[in-house]
């Protein structure tokens, strides 16, 4: 017969009581009232915060944007085809954040920082909020270091500094993306991390950019964030903030970063779509009232940090597309007023064969010569002045047939200077090469050449100086100044090459 031992039973009961873990979890839930067009209306979710992530029963994530008296408007980060009316939704208590690490370099990711290049998962131990506050006034210092784009027209007349925000604006097919990608290519060996954000573009265009960067070894220091035209509006709206969060990660670790938003017109359109579907009141051009804040809070995150924070920087090159050159539309004027200058690309110049098609007359950099080395300042002032005078004379010369010799000479010089600014795509020049090119033009060495010979001569001159007068480049690189010694080396080199070139061409 089995004997029942009371102490054994009490021990078992005591153990069970000790093992019992009474956990109470409070879950904030709601019910789907309506879903469609990337928007869901939820009843309940009483404690939800603006911008909080919510999770649907079948796994789709959304962002609570509209907090109304009797329902919550949620934008979906996916197609939401499996969400049903009456299904449950729970608030996650988190706001949108992404993992960040050095492992993202060389990868193509989407707005949620998931890889889309088929090369496996990315390991990351840290995470950053997609929307984080911009550095304050005390955290910044003024822009003083140049960020070279490799394009003569920009580096000499519309200089960009590290920590600046410079808008690239122009009609479709005027070379806006080409200017941005050339700038990325020129950062090779400059210890600058680049982030290229493609918003609402064709997948083929993004693939073309990635291939071009890979072929030239630029993907090693570049991250591509891509949300193509078929992505949900929510993800197109988030993509620039994801790019900014990745760039900030490097900026706060005392590194220099360059971020390109291509383009913000498409992000504004995605935001307009979301806002109209959420029944927010439309304003000018049917954009919502806070579309200025959409871009200002993004672009204010670009900064040159103070020495206490390690002097990291984030330079932003936002791109905006205009419709037949109309700079006074809503989005262009907004972004022009937020940025520190703009590079205006003209369809007329592009079609007449001037590439990059930069309209120097209405392009401006509000940082100015603070973002140039001394040697560039020495040669660029004269170039700017002569081109401005040439533009004025050219307009006047159309009405007059008999021009005096001085005017004819000035027009001839201007045409050669304009030729000197032309550059092929994906062929950025170093600062030293730019300085020698500008010096050759502004000091009249090209005046004796035919316009068609100018570019050929300059290519040969750059090669000749590199091999036969390396001292010139060494002096510029070490002193950052066009010294009398450097100038004499340059003059000798130009004279020698000019004689050789004229003999060849005879």
UniProtKB/Swiss-Prot annotation:
GO CC annotation: chloroplast thylakoid membrane; proton-transporting ATP synthase complex
Localization in the cell: Plastid, Chloroplast thylakoid membrane
Keyword terms: ATP synthesis, ATP-binding, CF(1), Chloroplast, Hydrogen ion transport, Ion transport, Membrane, Nucleotide-binding, Phosphoprotein, Plastid, Thylakoid, Translocase, Transport
CDD domains attached to this UniProt entry: ATP-synt_F1_alpha_C, ATP-synt_F1_alpha_N, F1-ATPase_alpha_CD
EC number: 7.1.2.2
Molecular function (Gene Ontology), one example: ATP binding
Name of this chain's protein: ATP synthase subunit alpha, chloroplastic
Species, as recorded: Olimarabidopsis pumila
């Amino acid at each position: 017969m089995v004997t029942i031992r009371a102490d054994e039973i009490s021990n078992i009961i005591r153990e069970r009581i000790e093992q019992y873990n009474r956990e109470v979890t409070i879950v904030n839930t709601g019910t789907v009232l309506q879903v469609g067009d990337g928007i869901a209306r939820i009843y309940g979710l009483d404690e939800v915060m603006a911008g909080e992530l919510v999770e649907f029963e079948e796994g789709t994530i959304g962002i609570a944007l509209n907090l109304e008296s009797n329902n919550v408007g949620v934008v979906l980060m996916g197609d939401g085809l499996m969400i049903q009316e009456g299904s449950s939704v729970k608030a996650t208590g988190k706001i949108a954040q992404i993992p960040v690490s050095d492992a993202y370099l060389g990868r193509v990711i989407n707005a949620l920082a998931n890889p889309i290049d088929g090369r496996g998962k990315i390991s990351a131990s840290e995470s950053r909020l997609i929307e984080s506050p911009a550095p304050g006034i005390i955290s910044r210092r003024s822009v003083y270091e140049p960020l070279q784009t490799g394009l003569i027209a920009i580096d000499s007349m519309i200089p960009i500094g590290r920590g600046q925000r410079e808008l690239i604006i122009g009609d479709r097919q005027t070379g806006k993306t080409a200017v941005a990608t050339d700038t990325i290519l020129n950062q090779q060996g400059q210890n600058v991390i680049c982030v290229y954000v493609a918003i609402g573009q064709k997948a083929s265009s993004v693939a073309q950019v990635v291939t071009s960067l890979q072929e030239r070894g630029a993907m090693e220091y570049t991250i591509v964030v891509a949300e193509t035209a078929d992505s949900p509006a929510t993800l197109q709206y988030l993509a620039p903030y994801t790019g900014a969060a990745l760039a900030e990660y490097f900026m706060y670790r005392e590194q220099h970063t360059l971020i390109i938003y291509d383009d913000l017109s498409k992000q504004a359109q995605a935001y307009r779509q979301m806002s109209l579907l959420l029944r927010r009141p439309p304003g000018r051009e049917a954009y919502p009232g806070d579309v200025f804040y959409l871009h200002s809070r993004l672009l204010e995150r670009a900064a040159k940090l103070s020495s206490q924070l390690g002097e990291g920087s984030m330079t932003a090159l936002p791109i905006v597309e205009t419709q037949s050159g109309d700079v006074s539309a809503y989005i262009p004027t907004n972004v022009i007023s937020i940025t520190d200058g703009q590079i205006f690309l003209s369809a007329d110049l592009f079609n007449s064969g001037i590439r990059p098609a930069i309209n120097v007359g209405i392009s401006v950099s509000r940082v100015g010569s603070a973002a140039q080395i001394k040697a560039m300042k020495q040669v660029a002032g004269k170039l700017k002045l002569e081109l401005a005078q040439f533009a004025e004379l050219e307009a006047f010369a159309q009405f007059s047939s008999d021009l005096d010799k001085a005017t004819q000479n000035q027009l001839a010089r201007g045409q050669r200077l304009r030729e000197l600014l032309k550059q092929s795509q994906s062929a950025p020049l170093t600062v030293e090469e730019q300085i020698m090119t500008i010096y050759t033009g502004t000091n009249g060495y090209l005046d004796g050449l035919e316009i068609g010979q100018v570019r050929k001569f300059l290519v040969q001159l750059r090669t000749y100086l590199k091999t036969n007068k390396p001292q010139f480049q060494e002096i510029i690189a070490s002193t950052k100044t066009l010294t009398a010694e450097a100038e004499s080396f340059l003059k000798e080199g130009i004279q020698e090459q000019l004689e050789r070139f004229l003999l060849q061409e005879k």
